[in-house]
Regions:
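Catalytic cores of secreted or luminal carbohydrate-active enzymes
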Residues: 360-409
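Short, small-residue-biased leader/transition segments that mark boundaries at the very start
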Residues: 2-6
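Conserved, mostly hydrophobic/aromatic
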Residues: 57, 103, 133, 171, ...
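C-terminal beta-sandwich/jelly-roll accessory domains of carbohydrate-active enzymes
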Residues: 439-499
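Aromatic-lined carbohydrate-binding/catalytic grooves of carbohydrate-active enzymes
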Residues: 94-231, 244
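Carbohydrate-binding surface patches
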Residues: 412-455
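Short Pro-Gly-centered flexible turn/kink motifs
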Residues: 52-71, 488-496
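Active-site neighborhood of glycoside hydrolase catalytic domains
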Residues: 161-163, 195-197, 201-358, 370, ...
Length: 499
C-alpha cells in the first residue's frame, strides 16, 4: 500500500484521549475535523426530542464528562479511568468493602420456584463457601411469567410460603446474606398498579403503546410515582433485612408522554426521566445506607458512570456464555474498573448460546469481575463442586488484586486464537495472568503471551514452572505455555516477588 501509516495508538504506545459521560440517558458523542485541521469533540445529551424550557433566573446543569489523556497508550488511559471511577464516582458502604460472593437463582429456576427450591439452592451454596443468595424475578404480585405483576411490589406469600422476612431469616441463619431483584421503573398492564393508575405509564394518547418484554415504562418524572416506589422498596428491604438489591431495567424508554407535564415541556421528559431515577436512587440509598446495589439493564444496557455513582457494580450482560463474555468484558475494561463488572459462572450448555465450556474456564472468566454463580449447584457433579470450592478460594485470595490492582489487556479481539489479561498489584509484589484458548486448529503452536507491569529490578517466580526471572525479563520475553490448551480451556498463572 502507498498510503501513510495509520496513526493508531496501541496498548503501550501513542497518544490517547478518552471521554466518559457521567449520564444515563440519551446521549451523543461526535468528533469532527474542521478546515483548519483542528479536531472538535462533543459529548452530552442527545438533541433529538430534547428541549428544556427555563424560566427567568433558572439554571440547567449539563451532564459532566470525565476526560483523560495518556501519552503511553490505551492501557494507561484505562488504568486512569479505573482509578477515577473507583475512587471518585463509586461511593457508599461498598466503595472499598469486600463484596460477597453470590448465587442468583434466575438461570436455575426462572419463574418456577418456591421456598423449598430456594432454600435447597442456598443450603448447597453455603456448603461450597458462597456468601449470599439473590432471589430474582417472580417473588411478588401475580408474577408467574413476564406478562404480569410488575409494579405490584408486594410479596407473594402463597408462593413463598410466608413473608419475605421469614425467608430472609432462614437464609441469614445459614450465615449467608440475602438479596432481592427489583425492576422499579417498569409496569405490567396486567397488574393492580396499572389498573389503579394507568396514567402512571408512559403512553401516547390514542395510540397502542409499544411493548418490550411485555411491559411499559413508568413515568419517573412524577413525584407520586417515585414516592410509591420508595415506600414499597424501603418497606420490603427494612422488613426483611435485605442486604443486596439488583435494580433491573429490561426495556428501552419510548412513547414518552406524561399525563401531568405541560404540553410545551414534552421535550424535557427524557432528561427528567433520568433525573427522576437518580432522585429515587439517592433517597433509596439514603434510607438503606448499608445496602449493596447492583445495577442491571437487560445486562449492560445502562452500564455507565452515572449509574456507578449509585451502584458500585453492574450486571455486565445477560449473556453469561464465558466465551462471549471475553469480548464483552474486554470492551468494558477500556473505561470501567473490573470491580464494577458483574460476572457469574453459569450452567452449560449455556442458556443463551448453547455452548459447552469447561467449568474451570467459566470460573476464570468470572474471576475478572464481581464473581458469583448463576445455577443450581445441587445439579452439578462432585468434581464440579470441588471446582466451586477452588474458585471461591481463588476469589478470596485474589480479591484485592482483581478489585484494586492494575489491569492489562494482553491481547486484542481478533489477532490470535486466545485471549489473555493480567492484574498487577499496585506495589508490584504479585501478578495474576489468565489465558483462555478461543479457537482450536490443527498442529497448534504453543501459546505465547506478553507479560506486563512487573517491576524491572525485582525477581519473580512463575507458578507455572517455578522459574525465577527479573521483572524486566518477564516483561520483554513474555510467557510461553509448553502445555497445549484445547479449545475453550483456560489457565491461571501467578507471578510472585522473590524477596
Amino acid at each position: 500500500s502507498l498510503h501513510d501509516a495509520l496513526p493508531i495508538s496501541g496498548e503501550t504506545h501513542g497518544s490517547c484521549i478518552g471521554a466518559c459521560l457521567v449520564y444515563s440517558g440519551n446521549f451523543v458523542a461526535a468528533a469532527q475535523k474542521d478546515q483548519k485541521n483542528q479536531t472538535r469533540f462533543q459529548m452530552g445529551i442527545h438533541p433529538t426530542n430534547f428541549c428544556f424550557h427555563l424560566e427567568k433566573g433558572e439554571a440547567f446543569d449539563t451532564p459532566q464528562a470525565i476526560l483523560s489523556y495518556s501519552g503511553t497508550g490505551l492501557t494507561k488511559l484505562s488504568q486512569q479511568y479505573h482509578e477515577i471511577i473507583r475512587e471518585h464516582i463509586c461511593r457508599g458502604a461498598y466503595k472499598h468493602a469486600k463484596r460477597p460472593i453470590l448465587i442468583n437463582n434466575w438461570e436455575a429456576t426462572y419463574f418456577d420456584f418456591n421456598e423449598e427450591k430456594i432454600l435447597k439452592i442456598a443450603e448447597q451454596a453455603q456448603k461450597l463457601g458462597i456468601e449470599m443468595l439473590v432471589l430474582d424475578d417472580g417473588w411478588f404480585g401475580k408474577r408467574e411469567d413476564d406478562n404480569s405483576g410488575l409494579g405490584d411490589w408486594f410479596v407473594n406469600e402463597k408462593k413463598m410460603n410466608g413473608s419475605m422476612a421469614q425467608l430472609a431469616e432462614k437464609i441469614h441463619r445459614m450465615g449467608m446474606k440475602f438479596g432481592l431483584w427489583f425492576e422499579p421503573e417498569m409496569i405490567s398492564e396486567d397488574s393492580d398498579l396499572y389498573r389503579a393508575h394507568p396514567d402512571w405509564a408512559f403512553a401516547i394518547p390514542g395510540r397502542v403503546p409499544n411493548h418490550s418484554r411485555n411491559q411499559l415504562v413508568l413515568d419517573m418524572t412524577r413525584e407520586d410515582v417515585r414516592e410509591y416506589l420508595l415506600e414499597r422498596l424501603t418497606t420490603i428491604v427494612h422488613d426483611a433485612k435485605i442486604d443486596y438489591v439488583k435494580w433491573d431495567m429490561n426495556r428501552s424508554v419510548c412513547d414518552v408522554y406524561s399525563h401531568v407535564a405541560a404540553q410545551n415541556r414534552n421535550g424535557e421528559l427524557y432528561h427528567r426521566y433520568v433525573l427522576g431515577v437518580y432522585d429515587l436512587l439517592e433517597r433509596f440509598l439514603a434510607a438503606c445506607p448499608d445496602l449493596l446495589l447492583e445495577g442491571c439493564s437487560g445486562g449492560g444496557g445502562r452500564y455507565d458512570a452515572g449509574m456507578m455513582y449509585y451502584s458500585p457494580q453492574i450486571w455486565c450482560s445477560d449473556n453469561t456464555d464465558a466465551i462471549n463474555r471475553l469480548s464483552i468484558q474486554y470492551g468494558s475494561s477500556f473505561f470501567y474498573p473490573i470491580s464494577t463488572v458483574g460476572s457469574h459462572v453459569s450452567v452449560c450448555p449455556n442458556h443463551q448460546t448453547g455452548r459447552v465450556t469447561p467449568f474451570r474456564t467459566r470460573g476464570d472468566v468470572a474471576l475478572a469481575g464481581s464473581f458469583g454463580y448463576e445455577m443450581d449447584l445441587n445439579k452439578i457433579s462432585e468434581e464440579e463442586k470441588e471446582m466451586v470450592k477452588e474458585q471461591v478460594a481463588a476469589m478470596h485470595e485474589y480479591y484485592e488484586l482483581t478489585h484494586e490492582g492494575l489491569y492489562y489487556r494482553l491481547t486484542g479481539l481478533k489477532k490470535q486464537d486466545f485471549m489473555a489479561w493480567e492484574f498487577v498489584a499496585k506495589d508490584q509484589s504479585r501478578a495474576l495472568l489468565t489465558i483462555v484458548k478461543t479457537d482450536a486448529e490443527g498442529n497448534m503452536l504453543p501459546v505465547h503471551t506478553k507479560v506486563c507491569g512487573l517491576a524491572e529490578d525485582k525477581l519473580y517466580r512463575c507458578s507455572l514452572d517455578q522459574e525465577v526471572r527479573l521483572g524486566r525479563t518477564w516483561n520483554r520475553a513474555g510467557l510461553t505455555l509448553h502445555q497445549v490448551l484445547g479449545e475453550y480451556e483456560s489457565i491461571r498463572v501467578e507471578f510472585t516477588e522473590v524477596k
